[in-house]
Amino acid sequence: MHSIIPIYQVYLLAELNYKRFMYKKLCILLIFSKLKVAKLLIDKYRMHNLYAIFAKLLNICKQIAGNLVNESGNVPRRGVVPKFSDLEVVALNMASEAVGIDSESLLFANLQEYRVEIPNLISRRQYNDRRKITSSLCNAIRERMVAKMDGGEDYFCIDSKPIEVCRIARSKRCSMGKKDFSKAPGVGYCASQSMYYYGYKLHAVCGLSGVIHSFDLTKASVHDIHYLKDVKVDYSNCTVIGDRGYISAQVQLDLFETANIRLEVPYRCNQKEWKPTFPAFAKARKRIETLFSQLCDQFMIIRNYAKDTDGLFARIIGKISALTILQYINYKNEKPIGRVKYALF
């Protein structure tokens, strides 16, 4: 005979099963709630880093700027004095590029969390306009940092980097340079990548320590050797190391006679009076190639969101200035200058 379970025991078993089910459900909800809180804390910590980086770079800019700005941090000019100073615009530009935020939409979406810390924050449109206006101030601050880090350099490396604006098939629809043809992009050829591109060419001169001393943007169709005309104006009594794109006996002689600049380039294999390349020069020239790799990797210099030429120039200045200020932080902390990814940690 089967034993008959009393009705109260059935109710007890049902209640026990229900409590077990609710206990498991509460445990699962508790786990998900902890994960959600942890995610919010991680986002807040990341944004706190952005504000801390902005404050740190602003302090450095104030120390370096000196007489470039007045007491309020603005370039002296007529009109209403902006509450969000020019130095703050420059520091915000450098901070966004240093952490890899090159989209203004993403930057201002993140900055909404810091309305209390940055009460005078301007709008996105105002920031876009003032970043173009303050690009000369940003470059002047960069040059002062370069002078402190690498002022007595006698050996320099020179090279160029293609900056593509759009594909060649879309070049006729590109709006850049429509108002001023002298600033318009052009079609050029990149020998290292074996391709034609539509855009500009970034020319740069850096020291052996890896600090960019000067740079300029030209049409992609301009040959590398023409930038040496600007080099002989800004430099003298030094040695410039380049690649085979700068081979020209006439230019070498002109640089030496006018500014006492010794241009060292490797010989072509089929060139008359061929001589082997000095190993130290070949190794030193790789430093500027490493700089271009850092600009492409960490600062995304080849990614273009600008719609006009002035905007592109301002972006390039901001990215190179962000690279320089990270090098300056390493220099002050007595760390290797080239390790820019570790400068803020």
Predicted regions span which residues?
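Short alpha-helical elements
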Residues: 2-345
